[in-house]
Amino acid sequence: MAAVDDATGLEAARKQKIHNLKLKTACLENEELVQELHVSDWSETQRQKLRGAHLKAEELVAAVDVGTKWNLTEVYDLAKLMRVCGLEMSQRELYRPEDKAQFMDIIAMKKVLQDLRQNRNKTRVVSFTQMIDNAIAKVEKVEEDVRRSQLDATQLAQVPTQTLKQVEDIMNVTQIQNALASTDDQIKTQLAHVEKTNEIQNVAMHDGEMQVAEEQMWTKVQLQERLIDLIQDKFRLISKCEEENQAFSKIHEVQKQANQETSQMKDAKRRLKQRCETDLKHIHDAIQKADLEDAEATKRHAANKEKSDRYIRENEDRQEETWNKIQDLERQLQKLGTERFDEVKRRIEEIDREEKRRVEYSQFLEVASQHKKLLELTVYNCDLAIRCTGLVEELVSEGCAAVKARHDKTSQDLAALRLDVHKEHLEYFRMLYLTLGSLIYKKEKRMEEIDRNIRTTHIQLEFCVETFDPNAKKHADMKKELYRLRQGVEEELAMLKEKQAKALEEFKESEEVSGRCWHRVQPPCDENNEEVLTRRSKMVEYRSHLTKQEEVKIAAEREEIKRALTAQLWCRWRAGPHRKQHCTHASNSVAAIIM
């Protein structure tokens, strides 16, 4: 298509050139005829012919003024415009009216935001509703601006991709309150069972049903161990939620990267806009300069034309005068004819130059206007791109701020919840540790009692063996039964101590937290030791009270035996000397027994 246009332009220029040449030839031929008439015979007819030729010359000169045209095809093009005006921007770097805007990625981003608006977690803890609505409004504004431009928004649409992904991920994070609801219900159920077990144990101990009380204590230990397991489950759930939430701690890096991308895009468009504005200024300056030159040239040509017309008129007037002096002024007439020929020739050349200049000026204005439109369109698109990029940057900033708020709030809630769970762990560990401590104390006392019974049974067995007492079999069976019972109690005691050590090991983390947060909390170990010492002190008081009563009875019995023995010895002493030695031996034996 461009080749056809060039061929058509060249053909038109060729025809116009032929036409101009014909006009010049006709005018010059007529001037030559004028010169020939100057040297011909001087007659009235010749003079009339000369006048007619002058009239025709005026018409031909007027035709040259009106009919001379120039079609320039290569005088002014874009390369010459850029060279003359010192332009930087080539057409490859400029937006064109036929360029189509690329905004499908913007529509896809709006679709992502609309999907996020339907997310079930968008109003939890930190609301995302307002942020998403603002983002959709900004994206719609960007889409509207891009549709009215020739911009390619593909790269711009990629900027908030990571931010929107972070928003979607944090909206889908597990809600810790819902995750812990089932565990809290199980803890409440276990606490209710523990309370019921305590009631049954208290009733059994009040009624003296020690076996039932011991079974209830074992049941309570199992329930409290289950409470510890549930607490550990809560810790695991909290840790899992913390791990999910930790992924959003570096949201500032996402925002920083997005800001860098938008800054680069803005800087690129600003540089492009600045270059276009610089070229526009150069074109405006060139147009103003061309306008001044055109005005000066037009004024100069008009002055030359007026001068030429005046000169031709004067020439004709002088020719008329010369006709009256034909004989005297022949040489002058010929000279004037020659001068006229030269002037007409010079004028034709001046007309050619002026018309050529006008065409060049017109072409310059046309090329400059087209390039000016492209530059102005590019500046417009740069402004739109900068505004759209700013809107996307605001979108990214608001999204990152919402993600950070959600992350900070979730971290605070998890920290507070972890502290509450540590409090629950302390309470349930205290219950379990005190229960195990009470059982261990009772089992140890039971062990001591069995050991005393074993020693007593062993002594009784030795007495029976010494005298071949048939009850020896009974004491031997009882001793075996006591050893079997002792082994069972020892295994239970070892199991209880193992449970106590395991619970203490699992309590270390909560113990550290309680040491940092609750300085006045009494450790369950110290509380258990105090209860054991209190229990032992109470038992010692009971034993001391019983021992005092036994000592009084024994002392009274010993006093009675002593009095009876004294009376008997007195009687034997009086019975005769042969019994003195026997009485002395008996007295020593009885004294030893009494002691």
UniProtKB/Swiss-Prot annotation:
Q: Please list where the region (Calmodulin-binding) is annotated.
A: 317-337
Localization recorded for this chain is: Cell projection, Cilium, Flagellum; Cytoplasm, Cytoskeleton
Question: Where does the signal peptide begin and end?
Answer: none
* Claim: Cytoplasm is one of the keywords in the record: yes
* Pfam annotation, one family: Flagellar_rod
Gene Ontology cellular-component annotations: cytoplasm; cytoskeleton; motile cilium
Xref: InterPro entries = Flagellar_rod, PFR_Component
Question: Region (Disordered) spans which residues?
Answer: 294-317
The organism's superkingdom is given as Eukaryota
The UniProt keyword set, sorted, is: Calmodulin-binding, Cell projection, Cilium, Cytoplasm, Cytoskeleton, Flagellum
State a single Gene Ontology molecular function: calmodulin binding
Q: Does the keyword Transcription apply?
A: no
More details: Coded by two tandemly repeated genes with almost identical ORF: PFRC and PFRD.
Query: Which proteins does it associate with, and in what oligomeric form?
Result: Heterodimer of a 69 kDa and a 73 kDa protein.
User: What is known about what this protein does?
Assistant: Major component of the paraflagellar rod (PFR). The PFR is a highly ordered lattices of fibrous proteins that are located inside the flagellum and assume a fixed orientation with respect to the microtubular axoneme.
Supply the name of the protein: 73 kDa paraflagellar rod protein
